[in-house]
Amino acid sequence: MELTARQKDILKAAIAIIANQGYEKLTTKNLATKIGVTEAALYRHFKNKRELVTMILGYFERISNDVLQEIRDGAYSPLESIRHFVEDRYILFSKYPDLAKVIFSEELFKNDPTFKGQFQCIMHKHKQAVENYILQAQQEGKIRNDLSPTQLFRIIVGSMRFTVTQWNLSDCAFDLKKEGSDLLETIMKLIETKQ
């Protein structure tokens, strides 16, 4: 489902509230105040808070699917695919730091098993894609084949998550794209075969 411009505005405002005040502060009153509409006007776009959070996760999933499709459509090597996926995440979160806070917030997912399941589905798609790039690179002799693709995925994406969290907690005190890119290159040097 394609979101209207107004729904995108509402989603961005909801993301900002969750990121800066917490999930409990995401109320129709606070959301309506933030975007300058009545509470009743919000219900034309979303039935309730659950639907709104589900749409936030759907929004993130669409963004993620877009980059995965871009990689599939491009002529990227497996190593370039890994780099493109990870660097795209750093660019996205640099542009939308509140989205990073929400997506990496365990508070959001412990409140509702539906949210947890939806986010696990998104993570599984990421895991499948990145592990596939790793496996292809191993088959091409570009990444050491004595390393587990699952463990490499956790190293690559786990370090990304830690870096984004560190960046958020420091109030964006460093260049996330540069630090992320430098970190990824360090990891790649460790896992790539010596040519």
Regions flagged by a language model, labelled:
Residues 55, 70-98, 149-156, 177:
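Hydrophobic alpha-helical connector segments
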Residues 62-65, 69, 95, 113-140, ...:
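Amphipathic alpha-helical packing segments from all-alpha helical-bundle domains
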Residues 100-104, 138-185, 194-195:
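Hydrophobic/aromatic-rich alpha-helical bundle segments in the mid-to-C-terminal region
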Residues 13-17, 92, 159:
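Short amphipathic alpha-helical elements of helix-turn-helix/winged-helix folds
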Residues 94-114:
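Amphipathic alpha-helical segments used for helix-helix packing
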Residues 6-9, 17-51, 55:
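Helix-turn-helix
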Residues 1-5, 195:
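N-terminal intrinsically disordered/low-complexity leader segments
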